[in-house]
């Protein structure tokens, strides 16, 4: 107990006063009382390691310094960044000019920055990974989420650290390698679980797993196999794998997982995603660019309920090893947005984020996910300055988006830093997609590691300073790591469930019971997300409903079984769910009770600690005060003893008396204190007894609630008694203090009195010592007497001393004695007090021990009470949960019982309905049977009458019967015919012979027969109606039976629970058999009635009735209640019909009686004599009828043949449709193949473009090499300026032509590609239209098939009816043959009439049939025409498609030819380089020859100079080789600049994307490979004759020579003046004109001495020409413009490209001299002796004017130059 109560290890102070006093603490800390217990108790379940690492939750920042490049080492290697130690860096202010290129300037000289870790430029990728990334990887394996992102300038090495190269891989491939090597056999290879949203997961079905594997294989097919370099495998085999060995990994898993998990069963599923944020829009890098629109699908950033951000529809891919992950990384890098900038060749233009998510799965019988962790590695794009990058267009927009996103990141970090100190501020996470994605990590998802990349170059000083300042603010941001703990809780709550899926998550949300007593436990983390879960459940329910709705009538039994099984499954699932929920509730209650117990124990421990501290402090204060009082008392007593020792006047008896008095007084004073202690001891014993009784009572108690109540009451009483005892103790201690203080005050007063008395005694003693000796005896005797008197009085004996005899002396002595007695009493009282104090201390220690024991007993009792209370609460909660469960079960049982009752009621109602319907069916069948029997009886009676009556009447009656039976709907016609029959009978000639009486009788007889037949017709009509009603009832019965079956299925589930349902099922089966029997009987009867009732003429009516019936049945299906009402009405109608039938039966009986009478009357008139003539006529009519029947048979045969033909045609159409469908499928397959081919072609086209760009880059690199070579050549080729200018001119023309050709080809290819895309889209639309037309054709054909089937059925029906009529006709023939002897002529007339009517009806039916056939044939023709048109359209589209395919093939061939041409051009470039090397060697040999010739010419010049002094002025115009040599040297110096400018131009064109050729490239004009293309203008001049120039046009066969005047030489004084002016001008020119570095001009020492002379000073005469005549001077002044000025005019009127190039040449000719002047400024103060140089104004000195405006003198006469200008102007008018 004490170890728990005192965790700091401080010994608990004892309450014994005799123990040594403990040193009192200086300050008492009461902050523990004011602690926020809710905050501390929320961390009870968390790990102690997490609490210990709470101080490490700040954002970790690591710095990596990029080493210098080769160019930076040469120019910027000042060392601005200096690494002090492993955690600090010093940034120095650069002293060079490059460091201050920006407008800002730092005021500090050096600044120090500290980081979590600093990695210098010499650190390798492996060391950086070990020092910075290894710990987050370990945390990932332990189940935590981490974020790592790089930050820095562009070109600072972020992507290199992130990805690395193939030789030296970066942190991302290394993390993958370490991850998979540490997991090894613990990988979960199945794809049953997939990550979802931020921290969730989905359970996949088998089909979904197949889809995931197919998607993965398609992704891996897009990129080839990637081989990782050996360094990465060294990493795996070396230190990294040792750092994460398998036992350590298992220990980490043990530490991070729950206690219930088995470490051997835990496996890991690794999933990977890769996306980028480009221009504030998110793209998945695993998804390639779509081939149709060249666009990528944008993804949406969203948040879950807890505010954690995730990317919707992001593709997650499961990875099984590091190679697959590396291949996916390469695939994403291939799709990443990268561009070329001035500072970086491959600058990433987006923020790319590679995420690794690990699912920890317990691989048991039912696998479940225990934890989800992720590692996000973000490669941020670098911040850029547009001044330095010089971006334009799309690059500038990208840079703006990158800078804004980084700026918002800085804002968010600054706000997070400030919000810790001040109030909570709004963090602008939503201002950019990057910060919105990082929001979840900044708000507690996981720790963050930030990698700062900087460069050491001086030019980026300001940017590095800003980056380092940003890193200092980022280090102060606190990042909470709350997701791991909440995730542990969430996954621990789901531990007991077997299936951790979406359903379980939903159950968690629905039944997540919270405890009200602990309010701080209700946090947002326990709220589960169920948006997608509810959607999935709704979808499942919808699919189940759809499946139940789409059941057929044929599969009734299977449906019943399925429903029974589903109901059983549902019940089982519900029971399992209830059990799981019960277990979960019990577990949660246990956990919460344990939490409450822990909380209460901690509270009680803290309270007891606080109380013990208070008691110890109080006792220490008392001890301290007592010690002070005792010290003061001892000091005063010592003083008093000293005083008393000096006084010897008093005796010992007085002291004794005083002691006795003091003892008595002190005893009286301390009686109260001893009584208090005794009473306290009695109270303690009473408390002990009460505690023992309470304990016994608690043990004896049975009801825990009553026991707890009693204990609480007694506990309160004990507390009150303890408080009273404490108050009494405090009062007693106060009284003791007061009494001691009073006694001390009295002692002080007495001591002061004693002092005064001692002083007075001393004075008296001195006086008495002077008294005489004789008086001593007397005083001695008197003293003895006094002593005796005192002894007699009972006083103690006095001390020896002198006593005055006088009465005042005796009084003083008495006072002294009293004082001595009082002092002795005080001393004895002190001694007694000390003894009593010791006794009291001993008693207090005993009481304190007893109090401690009592406290311990009380604590134990409190614990028992708390445990009992907890048990009570637990049992109450159990009871409540059980009650809730019981209530739920009872409610479910009640609902089930109610459903059973409702279903029973429904079943009973249905049974009643079935019984009623069966009764109605029985009654209807009986009525029908009775009617049929009555009709049969009537027919027999009529036959008897016929046998009695004449054969003519019998034939009439038979015909009428047949006619009535055949035509049920045409009753009126039959009545008319029956009415016309008697008229016809009596109109005949042979009837007139009979008497009038017989006529009247016959009329009455016929009338009665007609009435009978009318009644029979009505009966037949009623029977037909009843048959229709019976059909409707049958259909309704069928529907009701379907419903009954559904209800039976539901009832079967409930009857399975009950034992009484078996008998009912048997009854239902019996009833079903009865109903089936009734159906069969009804069907037979209905067939018999339909055969009698239906006719050929009623086809259309039957069709209309059928359509009406269909609509009626649909309406009846929708409204069952209306059907029930109609059934009731029909039952009533049946009753009415039965009554009418009974009435008619009575009428028939009456008629039968009348018939009998008529038969008796007409027996005499049966036999006649004219039967022979009637028989002849009857035979003739029979022959006619036979002929007619033969014709009808032929017609029917023809119709049957036509039907067969139509069937054959329909079969053909079906076959054609099948063929068309097969063709369409083939076409679809071809289209898919063609689309794949197009996609492959596009990829090849993109690869070709990339290859072209690579070739262009190689060309630019080769141009750089050519530049270096040219610099070397230019040092040797100082005399080849004119030749190089010619080459430049030719090169420009070649470039123009080639650019035009390349642009035209590219435009044509692009146009063709666009056309192909458009054609493909049009074809796709046409194919879709074709599909629609085919679907419509199929529908129409199906409708036609239906119509044909209906018509074929009608034809069959007609054929059956014809057969029946034939049979009837045969019967008639037989009857007629039998009754030939009894027939009459009137019967023949009637038969002819009836036969004519039948013929008319047959003709009408044939006409209708023909009209229907015509309509059908027309529809068939229309359909055939439509099908033919569709086939034609499809053929056309197929042809177009074939043509487009041929075009695509052609385009592909052209692309291949272009690639072949590129390869040829590369080979030609190599050939040209070889030729160039050969030319260089040839030029070197020529230069040597020229140098030797120049030496020879110098000698000749010296000779000529000697001769020139003697010669005339005309000889001055001759050529001087020495200045030409110098001029040629100057020109050679100038040559480097135009070439460099040409290189700059070629670079610029290469950057724009067009192919740029160099000045010496090979041209392939007219197929023959020539060194240079055909020039537009050829200019030839040699350094030997610089004043002559040969110009040749393409049309002219011979060149035209042009003479150029020479400039005169200057004197030495003028040369010096010109030098000074040139220096002034060069110093005045701005610095910005310098374009080339100094290193380019170090190797030209001749240029340092060249000075430019511009203006009129260049027109002065040289010293060598001083002797020339005035004529030559005038000629020189007239020809002031030199060759270069004329050359500028010549180029001004040339084509625009030549003008622009000429401008750059003229500008560059001035710039290098200025740069040389700057370099040689230091040497200006000490100029060397300049050699005598011959300056020329025309060629060597550059003109400081613009390229467009060239000044020249106006000349009246048109020179040869102007003629050339005009010609060139007209030629370049294009």
Swiss-Prot record:
Positions with biased composition (Acidic residues): 538-555
Q: Region Disordered: list its residue ranges.
A: 538-557, 740-799, 1625-1663
According to the record, the segments passing through the membrane are: none
Which cellular component, as a GO term, is one annotated location? intercellular bridge
* Compartments (UniProt record): Nucleus; Cytoplasm, Cytoskeleton; Cytoplasm, Cytoskeleton, Microtubule organizing center, Centrosome; Nucleus, Nucleolus
Task: Identify residues that carry Phosphoserine.
Answer: 486, 950, 1107, 1542, 1612, 1669, 1694
Q: Which domain of life is it from?
A: Eukaryota
Question: Which Gene Ontology BP annotations are present?
Answer: cell division; microtubule-based movement; neural tube closure; neuron projection morphogenesis; positive regulation of cell population proliferation; positive regulation of cytokinesis; positive regulation of intracellular protein transport; positive regulation of mitotic cytokinetic process
Query: Which residues are modified to Phosphothreonine?
Result: 1598
The principal location of this protein is nucleus
Tell me the keywords, alphabetical order. Answer: ATP-binding, Cell cycle, Cell division, Cell projection, Coiled coil, Cytoplasm, Cytoskeleton, Microtubule, Mitosis, Motor protein, Nucleotide-binding, Nucleus, Oncogene, Phosphoprotein
Q: Kinesin motor domain: which residues?
A: 58-477
Quaternary data: Oligomerizes (via kinesin motor domain). Associates with microtubules. Interacts (via C-terminal globular tail region) with PIN1 (via WW domain). Interacts with PRC1. Interacts with SHTN1 (via N-terminus); the interaction is direct and promotes the association of SHTN1 to microtubules in primary neurons. Associates with microtubules.
- The entry marks the following residues as binding ATP, namely 152-159
Organism encoding this protein:
Mus musculus
Please give the function described in this protein's UniProt entry: Plus-end-directed motor enzyme that is required for completion of cytokinesis. Required for proper midbody organization and abscission in polarized cortical stem cells. Plays a role in the regulation of neuronal polarization by mediating the transport of specific cargos. Participates in the mobilization of SHTN1 and in the accumulation of PIP3 in the growth cone of primary hippocampal neurons in a tubulin and actin-dependent manner.
Which residue ranges have biased composition labelled Polar residues? 741-778
Please name the GO terms that the record assigns under molecular function. ATP binding; ATP hydrolysis activity; microtubule binding; plus-end-directed microtubule motor activity; protein homodimerization activity; WW domain binding
Please state which protein family the record places this protein in. Belongs to the TRAFAC class myosin-kinesin ATPase superfamily. Kinesin family.
PTM section of the record:
Phosphorylated during mitosis by CDK1.
Positions with biased composition (Basic and acidic residues):
779-788, 1638-1651
What is the name listed in the Swiss-Prot or TrEMBL entry for this protein?
A: Kinesin-like protein KIF20B
Q: What is the effect of changing residue 1048 to A?
A: Reduces interaction with SHTN1
